[in-house]
Amino acid sequence: MTTHCISTGERQRAVKAALGQLPFDLLLTNAALIDMATGEVRNVDVGIVGALIASVHPCGTLTEALQTQDLAGAYLSPGLIDTHVHVESSHLPPERYAEIVVAQGTTTIFWDPHELANVLGVAGVRYAVDASRGLPLRVICAAPSSVPSTPGLEMSGADFAGQEMETMLAWPEVGGVAEVMDMHGVLNGSERMLEILNAGLNSGKLIEGHARGLSGADLQAYLAAGVTSDHELTSGADALEKLRAGLTLEIRGSHPYLLPEIVAALKTLPHLSSQITVCTDDVPPDMLLEKGGIVALLNMLIEQGLPATDVLRMATLNAAIRLQRNDLGLIAAGRVADLVVFDSLTQLRAQQVYVAGKLTAQQGKMQKPLNANPNVAAPRDTLRLQPLAAGDFVLKVPAIRHGKATLRHIKGARFTQWNETTVEVRNGEVQIPQGFSLIWVQHRHGRHQATPQLALLEGWGELRGAIATSYSHDSHNLVVLGRDAADMALAANALIASGGGMALSQNGEILAQVAMPIAGMLSDLPAAELAQQFKNLRDLSARIADWEPPYRVFKAIEGTCLACNAGPHLTDLGLTDGSTRQIVDPLIACWETPA
């Protein structure tokens, strides 16, 4: 359900019901309504006609209804809104994703399907739109602006510029331009970014930002280009600067370690701005099921000391204003009846969820299972690669046979840094130093036949086996980490055979694998089964790497190729510098020594 069109007849029935001239279709009585406009909690009855809230009135004053539900003093909130999400991070198709989040109280999402778009182009966005049709989740899609995120430094499955953006922005299901990740292109006036921004501005729809690390004049220039939001907050000071600059903040749940600092900064303000919203950005399937999506973030913010009414306003009224949806975000006559019942404001847990006036979920369970749209074919067979051999995973220095070489390499995971080291070379092959591992990237979209790219990694520990994934931001090429070439080839070939996903290998065996045959990033499995497989993969990864829980393994791999961010990253085109936007030769020097 992208929109719900209220017919003239339905609206006129609502008018008459509000006047007591017709019965309501549904009357929710004795509700503790959370008023997002005033911050009050008021005891009221709420009358619903069709998909529309017809009346919010004192308890017992209008009682005629075809159906009545006594809420017995439970809290009633507007449906929750996620202002920025990549559904693909759940590795679930839209109908499976909707089953989880709707039951948790999320009724609207703003989906940036740029993961699908980077594999499939405009067809990937069309799949997102069509596969979401008919679901009890209001899916507003964004037109991805970052396909690829850094042209010239990576190659994805498509290239988007002005024409593609205009095509997608003309679709009624598309609500704006998705996060503008090519900050460098915006600030330097690249023709491609001018076309993309102009398409957004001319459409009258919103333009999402990705202002990671921007400050001062650069931040001001980024806003002047037309961007109006940011979810890439890095500190409390960063959040305040961006809020003062005029950006809508999208506090995200995928970086919970930052929440205490951000909340502390917000508490220094005279009041919490309507420019503050919340988003999930990326949530893996096991965490989505176990802890929740937006509702998990709201509970974390409450734990940090923000009033529940303020936190809920971020996820309802503020979010609706951000998404230019005056029909959502308030429990008021004339608004769509997307409603959530909570039994407590200390720990939010949805007891009932109403979508467009219909009871859709109760006690965390959907009233009925959701089915995939039978008229939409899920995209498959997107890993256009032949089987690989162990020799494809060897870092070489062709200029010498035996000797030493000084190489640039990637240091760190969350925020990568440049470093260099001198290595032994035997028979033209680099001997991986103790404490180092390899990262390997291969283009998988069939658009070029470049050889695999390899680089050294420092600060990740020594991998005892290999980890492979076809889900790696943002071009989603095939990525493998490890030290042993045979294990790396084994993990990569497991994904090529299954159509994508994630795999762990060690000592010639596949320890764990999650197949994702839909675009190399979505699974066919039921959500609970996928979550269990993903958790098993996460747990078994401890045999391969001594990394921080709970999911640094996957977040780190996914981010190692994110060339739009500052620092070194490896892509299918080589070792890149996110600051200078250049491809860098990893070889600094090499020299022969006696064998």
From Swiss-Prot:
What name does UniProt use for this protein? Adenine deaminase
Question: Which Pfam families does UniProt cross-reference here?
Answer: Adenine_deam_C, Amidohydro_1
Enzyme Commission identifier(s): 3.5.4.2
Which superkingdom, per the lineage? Bacteria
Q: What does the entry give for GO biological process?
A: adenine catabolic process
Q: Record keywords: Hydrolase included?
A: yes
Q: Cross-referenced Gene3D superfamilies, in alphabetical order?
A: Metal-dependent hydrolases (3.20.20.140), Urease, subunit C, domain 1 (2.30.40.10)
What is the species of this protein?
Answer: Serratia proteamaculans (strain 568)
Q: Does the keyword Iron apply?
A: no
Q: Which GO terms describe its molecular function?
A: adenine deaminase activity
